[in-house]
Amino acid sequence: MGDPAPARSLDDIDLSALRDPAGIFELVEVVGNGTYGQVYKGRHVKTGQLAAIKVMDVTEDEEEEIKQEINMLKKYSHHRNIATYYGAFIKKSPPGNDDQLWLVMEFCGAGSVTDLVKNTKGNALKEDCIAYICREILRGLAHLHAHKVIHRDIKGQNVLLTENAEVKLVDFGVSAQLDRTVGRRNTFIGTPYWMAPEVIACDENPDATYDYRSDIWSLGITAIEMAEGAPPLCDMHPMRALFLIPRNPPPRLKSKKWSKKFIDFIDTCLIKTYLSRPPTEQLLKFPFIRDQPTERQVRIQLKDHIDRSRKKRGEKEETEYEYSGSEEEDDSHGEEGEPSSIMNVPGESTLRREFLRLQQENKSNSEALKQQQQLQQQQQRDPEAHIKHLLHQRQRRIEEQKEERRRVEEQQRREREQRKLQEKEQQRRLEDMQALRREEERRQAEREQEYKRKQLEEQRQSERLQRQLQQEHAYLKSLQQQQQQQQLQKQQQQQLLPGDRKPLYHYGRGMNPADKPAWAREVEERTRMNKQQNSPLAKSKPGSTGPEPPIPQASPGPPGPLSQTPPMQRPVEPQEGPHKSLVAHRVPLKPYAAPVPRSQSLQDQPTRNLAAFPASHDPDPAIPAPTATPSARGAVIRQNSDPTSEGPGPSPNPPAWVRPDNEAPPKVPQRTSSIATALNTSGAGGSRPAQAVRARPRSNSAWQIYLQRRAERGTPKPPGPPAQPPGPPNASSNPDLRRSDPGWERSDSVLPASHGHLPQAGSLERNRVGVSSKPDSSPVLSPGNKAKPDDHRSRPGRPADFVLLKERTLDEAPRPPKKAMDYSSSSEEVESSEDDEEEGEGGPAEGSRDTPGGRSDGDTDSVSTMVVHDVEEITGTQPPYGGGTMVVQRTPEEERNLLHADSNGYTNLPDVVQPSHSPTENSKGQSPPSKDGSGDYQSRGLVKAPGKSSFTMFVDLGIYQPGGSGDSIPITALVGGEGTRLDQLQYDVRKGSVVNVNPTNTRAHSETPEIRKYKKRFNSEILCAALWGVNLLVGTENGLMLLDRSGQGKVYGLIGRRRFQQMDVLEGLNLLITISGKRNKLRVYYLSWLRNKILHNDPEVEKKQGWTTVGDMEGCGHYRVVKYERIKFLVIALKSSVEVYAWAPKPYHKFMAFKSFADLPHRPLLVDLTVEEGQRLKVIYGSSAGFHAVDVDSGNSYDIYIPVHIQSQITPHAIIFLPNTDGMEMLLCYEDEGVYVNTYGRIIKDVVLQWGEMPTSVAYICSNQIMGWGEKAIEIRSVETGHLDGVFMHKRAQRLKFLCERNDKVFFASVRSGGSSQVYFMTLNRNCIMNW
């Protein structure tokens, strides 16, 4: 009945012997995709006849299949319902590339049945047309089946129509010839939706077989496709469809409008048992096929329909979005198509070409000889016919020449247009570059002008301050003379009345201020005026001040000599004692060009001022005693306030400035904002909890060295150490000790080490002089500002131990210079960046004090280093940690950046990024965080390190410790020991005064996390964001925007008036997945369309729709993209169900339904998917009751974890699958807790992760850690153990939301009242795993 077995005929085909198509056929355009290659519209070069050319690469794996297809076409294409095979050609490729096979077949110009259906109104053909097409398909199949050939891929795409409405079957790429004896196949090939159940069964059961009747099932599905526009289950993922087809009942027509004959025909074709399915001969006799109108009528009707649909298709193709995307995210985005198949490949073998040419010439010569003989015979028979034939050939040659000329002109026109476009694009780029250059020059000029203006202001301010200092000095001298006269009078009176000794001006508690002496009232008035001039912030926002203890209106005892010092000149007196203490010095490494004379500044002033007052316990009457601290009754000497201080004074009996021996220093109250930690250091014998205790006094030996150096310089000798070490002033009982008056420096204490195991930290001098009078964290007046001469200084007041710093800094690697003026932004931008009510108050007075001229110590424009050292180092005693010196360094460029407060106010930051301010910055009277907020972080082994933001950072020593040298301490503030108070660990870094706190080792950078933020303030709340390349797509309540992180921080609006709740970028697939809109639909946007909205370089793309929906789902609450091997799953949480979609690659290019789980017992709020041990799929979802799982295969739902100890509903935060557990173990985060369970609900660790507070967001980050964002802090924890690795305390309570993360960058947003938001990003340590 047929030919011999196919294996024998395959041997007859030698692919290498096929001719080259060059000069015979040429490709015109792509018209479709076949099983193994692309299909082109082609043209015969000589005759101009159109043909369909299938171009495929010849690989060793596919060579047999290609031979089989050629064999099928050659043998069975000579039928009216099968596309005619014209021939095959081989286009040779350069070595290393596969050769290309060109299969040339009959061209069907009307397209496929699928195209026809899509372009028909209602996506359905008329029943007569369907019957006609089905009959023609059956005739073609009958021809194949008669020769024991199964097509195996019958579908609308493989049924083509000619211009005359003839039906042709194409694509024999999967056809197979049946074995003569068995007659059945067991290979798994075909398109899923049209595939018969018995073909699918072959994949599951190796013993299963099928025969030619599988084509009948595919015909029935194609009939449904023509009636309904798509095959059944087309919304399902292909893999899911393969699973359902054998298990579901046979599909049926949805509409009732079809005739009984058509419905019966569908039912007959779609019988699941293929042995009961009728063959093609029987179906051709079926009433639906047999009883049709005349073929001529139907073909005319179908031809008209084809013409109409072609016009519609031409219009629709302009607006339909052509999707292009790579299958893998790692693939490069190359252009689709095979350009090499259209052009001749350069460098082809000349020998091969010559050989082929000779072959063709020989063949053409023989053909020409035959034609000539035929023509001579025909000419002899009919001369007129010969003349007609010649005329016809001539006419045809003329037409070919015209066509060739037209083609050349068209090509030249295209080239001209292309050149014009390129020239325009080049000109536009040039103009853009020139505009950018002009803008940069303009900005540079503005920056230079601003710099000059600031320099002039600094100079004027310096002169003003100098004049003011001179006036104050003169006024003080007069006051001192007046005071001396009054004291002489008092002494004379006391000599007359020796039994009656009263302190100077001991005010009663109810005494009227008007009764004070005239000099005191005058100084009080002068000080109040000075405060009003220099501290505008002190009165502008009274509402922001925190609670302060009440102050009595009057206090007994004299105001004392120090009280008379004006605010700009008031020194900070040291607190000496018989034991070892710490000294902090400001060490300028390079003098400023025009410094204010130090002799008239802070350091030398107290010696002259105090010299006029006697002290009875002083061994040398000419030298004043050191400042005493409050007495046992809690009295406070107001050292930095106005002379009419109304705090309690000392006892009348002892002199005003000497502390009695039997008095103990007052205890400092514990602040609620202080962070108690316990350090576990390798050098310590054990860890001791930090306590709020008094400062450690200085040793006698160090005191003697100090006096000896003063004596060598000829300075007046200060008094010896008192018997009892003076304690720190009570900052909470005296508000002036919490206030920094303008124009002088104050120091914040740093906690010393526990029992000498760590170098004791002294006091850090304030970074800047000119700051507004706002309360500081926990001021403790320290000996760091005592005036000490030095041989190495360039002006008075230089510390004596400057050599220590020199030795320290010689070992350090040089830092790269940073340009101070590279970063410019207006003061308005700086003020609006963090806190309007706090930053917008730094008026001209404060700004001018920030300038170099406003610094009373003249220590500007120099490498300013804050050194905290141990006094015992001078005597050669080495502390346990090597040198024991902690250095906080700034380069000259950084110092200049700090001084230019009208710039960003921050160092090392471009315009794009503006970091948040320091924890204590501009916090006028701000109350500290509540006890419950900070108490949670006080016992977790943390050390606070300053950060460049409104977040105060606490870091575990073991997590972010850089591996530096052994003689430097990893972070610059240490905790523990007696003699300190816990809340002294506060760096008072004011606006624009950011101190680089990197350890002084040779590492290029610090691995301590830092937080910065973008200046752009979004008007509506930021709900989500995703990184697209380096840039950030930001979704808000009102639209989608792109934040350009690579340029100047510009924000591009992409989509407006649409709410974006969640988003993810899949760059390899050219997709942005979102939950967006009022109805919370799952929409997919094409990245190329979004890109064009920014660049506007492709006008064709603008006409196309740039997004589509996934399914018809509304009310999506959450989704998750899960990548497993090469499959991308999309799990979606709806109101009462969970949908699972999967990405379908070519030719579908979309997410398609995979599984649906409806009627769940709990509403899913959070959803995820895991693949257990690489085999079992499970959906994990969180609800208000707990966490649950659904087995994907069986659909069974069960509870994983229900927190029974919580009676009310819970808020699930995150489902985190632990690494290296094969998807079996996870951390479930809810409320302020987290538990470790496996996918079967068994607790795997007796650890309950406990957050310090209720987080608003929880996220797993790349460093194998989890982060929790709360209103008071950001916590970083280990995902394996829940151990707290670090904390960032907020300056104020605020609502934060995690956005996205990549590598060592974590992005989150803050939401303020009124809905405005800003984007922050945190840079983690660089050792995090790069697994993006």
UniProtKB/Swiss-Prot annotation:
Modification type Phosphoserine: residues: 324, 326, 641, 701, 754, 763, 777-778, 782
Compositionally biased residues, Basic and acidic residues: 396-466, 518-528, 736-748, 804-821
Tagged with keyword Metal-binding: no
Omega-N-methylarginine modified-residue sites: 501, 509
GO biological process: actin cytoskeleton organization; brain development; chemical synaptic transmission; dendrite morphogenesis; JNK cascade; MAPK cascade; neuron projection morphogenesis; positive regulation of JNK cascade
Highest taxon listed in the record's lineage: Eukaryota
Domain called Protein kinase: residue spans: 25-289
Biased segments, Low complexity type: 371-380, 479-497
Residue intervals of the CNH domain: 1019-1306
Biased composition (Polar residues): 598-608, 670-682, 915-929
Region (Disordered): 300-347, 363-383, 395-887, 902-943
Binding site for ATP: 31-39, 54
Protein name, per record: Misshapen-like kinase 1
Lineage: Eukaryota, Metazoa, Chordata, Craniata, Vertebrata
